Regions:
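Long, K/E/R/D-enriched contiguous segments that form extended
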Residues: 263-303
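Short acidic (Asp/Glu) and glycine-rich catalytic loops that position anionic groups and cofactors
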Residues: 39-41, 66-68, 252-257, 267-269, ...
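N-terminal accessory/capping or targeting/presequence segment of soluble
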Residues: 1-67, 75, 79-222, 280, ...
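Short coil/turn segments at secondary-structure boundaries
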Residues: 153-156, 233, 258-259, 287-291
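A glycine-rich phosphate-binding loop feature that marks nucleotide/adenosyl-phosphate handling sites
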Residues: 156-161, 235-238, 292, 303
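Short, surface-exposed secondary-structure junctions/capping segments
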Residues: 116-119, 226, 230, 274
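Terminal amphipathic helices with adjacent charged low-complexity linkers/tails
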Residues: 86-114, 237-274
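Conserved catalytic alpha/beta cores of large enzymes that bind or transform nucleotide phosphates
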Residues: 62, 70, 74, 200-259, ...
Length: 303
């Protein structure tokens, strides 16, 4: 967690950091060009301004700097499978390989912040419109249409919608760091169990969801013996988990679009009603602000 910031000093988002034996580079998008320049000033790190002409992607850069027959190490828990697939294509001309490493666990021992574990709770059905059990049945029907019997959900916003699960692991975003494995008759939520409120645990169990430890995801999926065709979207499932799924002989992995994306986009009547109410409240707040602003300006107040 936050290992990119620890090694590079850069505090932005949507970034990659590459280190070779002789050089290093960090990627930043347009929101962070100025910040990144300041934070890496005085170091050997090159700033790669994403989207600028002539600036290679992290994948292209790795393909260029990796020596013939070289090995690229990466943390498979923080790199999605689609990124790794792109890396493999770039490394192929040099017969390069990829290896999952967890070097930050060895190098960053002291002072490392804990993984976010804000209280996890369940959004009531009166706001969500459907219970977790109802949404799980809807998902299973969609999976059947796509020729699958199971799914590994790794995208946090999709998981939040599926189980009505809420937390504050990401500032200003109500997500909980977790995974969910859904089969025709089971749903397993991999999450730090101590953070789940008693009410949320009871609600999940009542809706057919069992809890497992967050860190047991790799061992848990490796231990699955029930044959399943598992939908796992490479763009939203990390490489380490995807590898475990592919290496389990009981599981057939299908890389396809996550049906939850479209499902959560279709708002039910309860959600629509709350959206309308929210827009009305926003409108009232905006009008009050404009009136206050105009009155202060009219009185000659300097703002």
């Amino acid at each position: 967690y936050t290992s990119l910031t620890y090694f590079s000093g850069f505090h932005g988002e949507n970034s990659n950091f590459v280190v070779t034996m002789t050089e290093s580079a960090v990627w930043a998008d347009g929101r962070y060009f100025v910040q990144a320049e300041k934070e890496i000033a005085g170091t050997e790190i090159q700033l790669m301004r994403m989207g600028e002409p002539g600036v290679p992607t992290a994948e292209e850069y790795c393909g260029k700097v990796l020596p013939e027959g070289g090995t690229l190490g990466l943390c498979g828990l923080t790199a999605n499978c689609a990124l790794v697939n792109n890396l493999k294509k770039e490394l192929e001309p040099k017969h390069g390989s990829i290896k999952t490493l967890f070097l930050e666990d060895e190098l960053w021992v002291e002072g490392r912040p804990a993984r976010p574990a804000t209280p996890a709770w369940i959004l009531p059905k009166e706001y969500a419109g459907f219970s977790p059990a109802e949404k799980l049945e809807q998902l299973r029907a969609k999976l059947k249409e796509q020729g699958c019997t199971a799914q590994l959900v790794g995208k946090l916003d999709n998981l939040a919608w599926l189980l009505n699960l809420r937390a504050m692991d990401i500032e200003c975003t109500p997500y909980a760091m977790a995974y969910c494995y859904v089969t025709p008759d089971r749903a397993v939520l991999f999450i730090d169990q101590a953070r789940v409120t008693p009410e949320a645990k009871a609600e999940l169990e009542a809706n057919g969801v069992t809890l497992a430890d967050y860190d047991s995801i790799l061992d848990g999926m490796a231990a699955e013996t029930e044959p399943q065709t598992v939908l796992a979207e490479s763009a939203t499932v990390n490489y380490a988990v995807y590898q475990v799924l592919e290496n389990n002989p009981a599981l057939t992995v299908k890389d396809a679009a996550d049906p939850l994306l479209a499902m959560k986009g279709v708002k039910n009547e309860v959600e629509l009603a709350h959206l309308r109410e929210s827009h009305l409240r926003d409108a009232v707040a905006m009008v009050r602000f404009q009136i206050e602003l105009e009155n202060r300006l009219a009185s000659g107040e300097e703002l």
